[in-house]
Amino acid sequence: MTDPNRVEPTLTGPVLIVGVGLIGASIGKALMREGTDVHLWDIDRDNSLIAAGHGAGRLGNLADDAYRMIVIATPPAVVAQTVVERLTRHPQAVVTDTTSVKGAVLAELTTLATEHGIDISRYVGSHPMAGTQYTGPLTACSELFVDRTWVVAPRTDNRYDDVQQVVALARACGARVVSMDAHEHDRAVAEVSHLPHLMSILTAANLRRARPEHLSLAGPGIRDVTRIARSQTTMWRQILSSNCVEVRSQLEAIRDDLDDLLSRLNDSERLEEFLSVGQAGARKVAGKHGHQMVETTAVVVEIPDTPGALARLFADVEAAGINVEDLSVEHNPAREAGFLSIDVAPSRAEQLTASMRNHGWSVRS
């Protein structure tokens, strides 16, 4: 099939979004920003009303054959059944979904289509690789998909123009489109999304045994690692169950690595070898703008928790004329202050440190 990145298709509306939680409502807001006619439907009418009230579209009120695109953003467990229902109700529409597991949906959909004699060629699976630990239409954001990957999973029975409509949907939301087979997609998300989520949960679960005075020592590292463990459990149960084969394979590989690590703990040289393997894996993750990660040095500046302090600091960093590779903030639990870690090229760290001190900032050595 033709690479979807070679053309610039235009999305044809009206668009009906079925399921308006975080993802559905965010798609609605993004499309409304682009001037698309967006309609909303949710089994919980309150969700539709809230989303409509916050600019995600209007309540669906057109004839079934008027819609040209149906976006299914329901919980994973009901996606296949919902796709079948919408293919039947909307004969002129391309139907796509946003669920993070494609193979299981396609298998169930194929079974349902065979049982009911339904043509599923107008269904093109997709998956926007974006989200937060929050849920519901009140958390929606029109910028959620900007510069994020949106996987489109075409099949040989799809019409080219139908696939291009899903590509146009993703691009209208500001996303970067990647075309990928459904089963390859499921392995990929197990590696880069589902396994990391479970590692976050395992780390957070281990904290239940920690004493309160030990938890008081926690810094930004543990908060970063456990942040996604706060995500909604019902949705993640469905995601992990749907992709259980690929997730199990990843967990078994981690189990082997844990056994290897345990065998190395009393041997410093072998332990360092293992740590180096982790560094090599981290370097494979794309850095800024999708480029290879580069070596940086952190210049850590103390900032008071007062209005305007961060803006002044950013202005002074800009005045130094040094390119910033990354930023992170650590809060001081003992007093009303924080620390901004400014990652720059190692050759510029000393210059930035001197500039910050000249502007009156306290810099950690």
Which role fits each region the language model picked out?
Residues 211-279, 296-299:
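Interdomain hinge/lid region at the active-site interface
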Residues 122-159:
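Active-site capping/gating segments
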Residues 2-60, 69:
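NAD(P)+-binding Rossmann beta1-loop-alpha1 motif at the extreme N-terminus of oxidoreductases
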